[in-house]
Amino acid sequence: MATELKKGPLPTDIEETVITIMREEGVRYITAKILRMRLESKYQMEFGPHKAAIDDIVARAMQRPEFKKQLELALKEKDASKSSGGKGSKRARSAGAEAPSKTKKEMTEKPKKPADYPKPAVSSYLLFVADQREELKAKNPGMQNTAILQTLGKMWSDASDDVKEHYRKKAEEDKARFRREVDEYKRQGGKEYGRGGKIKKDSNAPKRAMTSFMFFSSDFRSKHSDLSIVEMSKAAGAAWKELGPEERKVYEEMAEKDKERYKREMAALPK
């Protein structure tokens, strides 16, 4: 019997959780429905009333370089698939094709975590995947990685409350282990790092201002929740180009107000 979901305010770590889920599922495959199911599974609460807020978080997250690259690659592969009649694997490269080389900026921009930095905590979903992946591959030797991940995602969605609770407890234990190790690392003079090797920012810092296009994308997403993020971004981009000056002005004013809000909150921070 499924547990009845409670109602309540957004969790304080919701933005971090949304970004984690987007990383785990991938921009190519995640949809509003998958995101909502994952959030409801983690927090055991309804997220329907918070749809607009979640859309805003996704819009901001899509401005991150890691997700922009995923989106750009997915759109290129989708266009290439269409131009070639959709034949062959979307992920396949031609035999002579080489991966694009990184620029000096890309190679030097991000500071690397020290080798002795504590191993990051793993989410309940990834712990489940780690336990089930090899068994699934053994039973389906010819299954592609994409299909394996999609199957594992469905297995997780269909898993019983007891199974999910088991992995949630394991994830909480791992999170506590990571927190202890990071605290000890900091006591010894080290700095705390976030994902991607960047030094962790202040969690109390104001949220960055949204652009006019981000506000439009959030509005567009709320009306087309059946689309994947890749399809959504492409459709929103096309729709944005079709907007007239008066229609854009609405979103530009929203962006200007948010920019002023960000400036005020930054100015109010203790020096």
Curated annotation (Swiss-Prot):
DNA-binding region, residues: 118-186, 206-270
Main location: nucleus
InterPro entries: DEK_C, HMG_box_dom, HMG_box_dom_sf, HMGB
Keyword Lyase (UniProt): no
UniProt feature, compositional bias: Basic and acidic residues: 101-116
Keywords tagged on the record: DNA-binding, Nucleus, Repeat
GO cellular component terms attached to this protein's record: nucleus
Spans annotated as Disordered: 75-118
Organism superkingdom: Eukaryota
Location in or out of the cell: Nucleus
Pfam family, one: DEK_C
Function: Unknown. May play a role in transcription and/or DNA replication. It is not known whether this protein is DNA sequence binding-specific or not.
Name of this protein: High mobility group protein homolog TDP-1
Taxonomic source organism: Trypanosoma brucei rhodesiense
